[in-house]
């Protein structure tokens, strides 16, 4: 699995209200989380498809 996908969800430091996706390594699924718009880490995807393409093994 890509090491990015092992990072915890991180909403960042800004106060926006964006619904993005992250890979939850406990459930082994891409799930939604609230992203503030800046900061955070690389386990942060705009779409479910991007998350799945990066984190699901083929």
UniProtKB/Swiss-Prot annotation:
Major localisation: secreted
What keywords tag this UniProt record?
Disulfide bond, Nematocyst, Protease inhibitor, Secreted, Serine protease inhibitor
The cysteines covalently paired via disulfide bonds are: 5-55, 14-38, 30-51
Q: Where is this site: Reactive bond?
A: 15-16
Q: What residue stretches are annotated with the BPTI/Kunitz inhibitor domain?
A: 5-55
Looking at the UniProt record for this protein, which Gene Ontology cellular component terms does it annotate, in alphabetical order? extracellular space; nematocyst
Location of the protein in the cell: Secreted; Nematocyst
Question: Which molecular function term from Gene Ontology is one that the record holds?
Answer: serine-type endopeptidase inhibitor activity
Q: Which PROSITE patterns match?
A: BPTI_KUNITZ_1 (PS00280), BPTI_KUNITZ_2 (PS50279)
Q: Which PANTHER family match?
A: KUNITZ-TYPE PROTEASE INHIBITOR-RELATED, SERINE PEPTIDASE INHIBITOR, KUNITZ TYPE, 3
Q: Which family does it belong to?
A: Belongs to the venom Kunitz-type family. Sea anemone type 2 potassium channel toxin subfamily.
Q: What is the name listed in the Swiss-Prot or TrEMBL entry for this protein? A: PI-actitoxin-Axm2b
Q: Which organism is it from?
A: Anthopleura aff. xanthogrammica (Sea anemone)
């Amino acid at each position: 699995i890509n090491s990015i996908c092992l990072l915890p969800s991180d909403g960042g430091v800004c106060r926006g209200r964006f619904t993005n996706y992250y890979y939850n390594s406990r459930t082994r699924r891409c799930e939604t989380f609230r992203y503030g718009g800046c900061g955070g880490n690389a386990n942060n995807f705009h779409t479910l498809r991007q998350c799945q393409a990066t984190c699901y093994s083929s």
